[in-house]
Amino acid sequence: FSFLIFVGKEINIMRLEERYDKVLAWFRERMPVANTELQYNDPFQLLVAVLSAQCTDKRVNMVTPALFEQFPDAESMSKASVEEIFELIKSISYPNNKSKHLSAMAKKLMEDFNGIVPDDFELLQTLPGVGRKTANVMEAVAFKRPAMPVDTHVFRVADRIGLVTGAKTPLETEKQLVAHIPAEWLSTAHHWLILHGRYVCVARKPKCEECGIAEWCRYHQKKLS
């Protein structure tokens, strides 16, 4: 009996590894280069753009040019009032909280880091408004290190495809993805999952008929059964 359980686990592991192999190979062939859709010029501007998110990147990109023109770096933003920042980002979601975070973040950068965004995962999380996901974005995008930021798209798509099992939190999803995706592809895979979730595997009505990885997708297979 115990042998059968062991064999069953081995089969499940093989299926999971095969799914990863097929899905990653598909993305590598069709999207060898994948990047964020946020527009920025340096780590500070990327951090500002990420902290301005929780809405579409397109919406963020509509407000950041004027914001960066007026406050291109931590020093200039640290001298701005919360109200001045608010006026420039008021068309995005939660502008009250975001303007406060941006102001406090810029001041913290000036006080503790000479205006330079730290390239350390733990230090990044000492900045106001910066949690694990944002710190991972900075690691992956700004500093080109292996990291897997888990936003709503990554969380949903990884679960639907079947890349994760029983993950209830972004951290659980992150750990499972990191355990199976080669480090050299980790940051790129983050973009693959985001873009796939944004344009194909959308939240309410996933476009399975347009999906190139449907044949390996757990969600699609359940629909067919």
Predicted regions and their residues:
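Catalytic cores of DNA base-excision repair glycosylases
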Residues: 15-225
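Short, Lys/Arg-enriched N-terminal segments with co-localized hydrophobic residues
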Residues: 1-13
